[in-house]
């Protein structure tokens, strides 16, 4: 999507705020003893309160308001009976629509403290990779520079990127052009970012793996070697003044 009017911009900001509010409220509630279904109910209540609709349910008939992935799950984890424990690596991915406009956001974090420092490291480096990618976001620059920055950040920290999970265009649908915002450099991709373009940028940083495979059900993804993986995702509007993150709530 290319934002052309202030009405479109305000609509994107509104759904971005709602998704961010859901994400942050769910993260705050992720404590040992809670189930992923209970966390998902928080999203349901907040979506209803704000007049928004879960995109996974609306677009994909996904069996949950949000995707909650724990430890071996990398993405698209189904909320259910799974109980959260101290030291778990959790990813919460929230996407929704309101009045025909979408936002998509996600965060990975460690619950409490873990005796496995690599869990926290992949989370920290995912954040660093996203921040470095944002330095490349401006009209007229190559889309592939985002992936180059993400991959470089991973390598500098002796980590890897997941190559078959990518960002994407977003705005008037959950997935639209560009179809992929890679987490590595693709020299064949000559796509240029445009003023007002809306994209979801989501680095997936891993301890060892470079690809995910189907997991225990038709939705969840895992790595074959059970590597830890962390993701950070925001909906980003390309502007001449730099990236505008609709899913970031200012402190």
UniProtKB/Swiss-Prot annotation:
What detail does the entry give on cofactor binding?
Binds 2 divalent metal cations per subunit. Has a high-affinity and a low affinity metal-binding site. The true nature of the physiological cofactor is under debate. The enzyme is active with cobalt, zinc, manganese or divalent iron ions. Most likely, methionine aminopeptidases function as mononuclear Fe(2+)-metalloproteases under physiological conditions, and the catalytically relevant metal-binding site has been assigned to the histidine-containing high-affinity site.
Gene3D superfamilies, per this entry?
Creatinase/methionine aminopeptidase superfamily (3.90.230.10)
> What EC number(s) does its UniProt record assign?
3.4.11.18
* One Gene Ontology biological process: proteolysis
Q: What is one Pfam family matched by this protein? A: Peptidase_M24
Reaction catalysed by this chain? Release of N-terminal amino acids, preferentially methionine, from peptides and arylamides
**What's its job?**
Removes the N-terminal methionine from nascent proteins. The N-terminal methionine is often cleaved when the second residue in the primary sequence is small and uncharged (Met-Ala-, Cys, Gly, Pro, Ser, Thr, or Val). Requires deformylation of the N(alpha)-formylated initiator methionine before it can be hydrolyzed.
CDD domains, sorted: MetAP1
Q: Where does a divalent metal cation 1 bind?
A: 93, 104, 233
Keywords, comma-separated and alphabetical: Aminopeptidase, Hydrolase, Metal-binding, Protease
Q: What is this protein called?
A: Methionine aminopeptidase
HAMAP family from the xrefs?
Answer: MetAP_1
Q: Which GO molecular function entries does the Swiss-Prot or TrEMBL record give?
A: initiator methionyl aminopeptidase activity; metal ion binding; metalloaminopeptidase activity
Name of the gene encoding the protein in the UniProt record: map
Alphabetized NCBIfam families for the sequence: met_pdase_I
* Protein species of origin: Staphylococcus epidermidis (strain ATCC 35984 / DSM 28319 / BCRC 17069 / CCUG 31568 / BM 3577 / RP62A)
Q: Which cofactor does it need?
A: Co(2+); Zn(2+); Mn(2+); Fe(2+)
> What assembly does the database describe for this protein?
Monomer.
* UniProt-annotated binding residues for a divalent metal cation 2: 104, 168, 202, 233
Keyword Metal-binding annotated: yes
Quick one: which residues bind substrate?
76, 175
Return the similarity comment.
Belongs to the peptidase M24A family. Methionine aminopeptidase type 1 subfamily.
Matching InterPro entries, A to Z?
Creatinase/aminopeptidase-like, Pept_M24, Pept_M24_MAP, Pept_M24A_MAP1
